[in-house]
A protein has these predicted regions:
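Glycine-rich portal/gate segments that line the openings of hydrophobic small-molecule binding cavities
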Residues: 27, 37-82, 93-95, 130-145, ...
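Beta-strand elements of well-folded, non-transmembrane domains
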Residues: 11, 54-56, 66, 89, ...
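Short hydrophobic/aromatic-rich motifs at helix boundaries and adjacent loops
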Residues: 6-7, 31-32, 55-58, 107-112
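Beta-strand/loop substructures that line and gate deep hydrophobic ligand-binding cavities in soluble
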Residues: 76-134, 150-152
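Hydrophobic ligand-binding cavity/cleft-lining segments
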Residues: 1-42, 160-163
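Short amphipathic alpha-helical segments, especially helix-boundary/capping motifs
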Residues: 22-24, 34-36, 58-62, 111-116
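Generic structural detector for well-ordered beta-strands
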Residues: 6-10, 61, 86
Length: 163
C-alpha cells in the first residue's frame, strides 16, 4: 500500500536534487510545515524534525541517500511511514516522485486485515494522496517561481493544518 505524486520539470536533475537536499528545505515548499529543523546533515544518517501547522512533530531519519534522491523513515513514538524522494532525468529535464509507504498498523486501531484494508481505501489513502499532492505541488510552485509558498496554499488538510 502506498500513495505517490510526481512532477515534471524543464530543469536539470542536479538542480532539483540540490533543492530537496537542502537542510530545512520543507520550510520553503511544504504547505503544512510550521518548521523543519535539520539536526544532523547531510547524507545517510541525516536527521531532521518536521513540525506541522497543528503542532504535531515528527522526526525524519534519512537512509539510502543516492545520486537519485533518498529514503526516510518518519514518525514519533511509532514509525508512521517510509517515504521515498526520487529524481530521474538529465541536464535538461527531470521528474520528482515522492512515495509514501505507510505503516498501516499505526493508522488503524484494528488488527483485522479486512478492516485495515477498508480503512485504507476509504479514508487513509485519500487523505495521504491529498497530502502528498499538496507537498509536490508546493515544491513545483517553489522551484518554478523561486518563491516560498504560503501555509495551506493549496487548501487545508484535516490531519496537519491548524483549524
Amino acid at each position: 500500500m502506498y500513495v505517490e505524486s510526481k512532477a515534471y520539470f524543464k530543469m536539470p536533475k542536479s538542480f532539483i536534487l540540490g533543492q530537496i537536499r537542502e537542510p530545512g528545505c520543507l520550510n520553503r515548499f511544504h504547505p503544512f510545515c510550521k518548521r523543519n529543523i535539520a539536526h544532523k546533515w547531510p547524507g545517510n544518517g541525516s536527521i531532521d524534525e518536521l513540525e506541522y501547522l497543528n503542532g504535531r512533530k515528527y522526526k525524519r531519519y534519512f537512509f539510502n541517500w543516492t545520486d537519485n534522491g533518498y529514503d526516510l523513515k518518519i514518525g514519533g513514538k511509532k514509525e508512521m511511514a517510509i517515504v521515498n524522494w526520487y529524481v530521474e532525468g538529465s541536464d535538461e529535464e527531470c521528474s520528482l516522485r515522492v512515495r509514501i509507504n505507510p505503516n498501516i498498523e499505526n493508522y488503524v486501531p484494528f488488527k483485522n486485515i479486512l478492516i485495515q484494508n477498508i480503512f485504507w481505501f476509504l479514508y487513509i489513502r485519500p487523505k495521504l494522496q491529498s497530502y502528498i499532492n499538496h507537498v509536490v505541488n508546493g515544491f513545483s510552485f517553489y522551484v518554478s517561481n523561486n518563491t516560498d509558498i504560503n501555509k495551506n496554499q493549496f487548501g487545508k488538510h484535516s490531519w496537519f493544518s491548524s483549524y
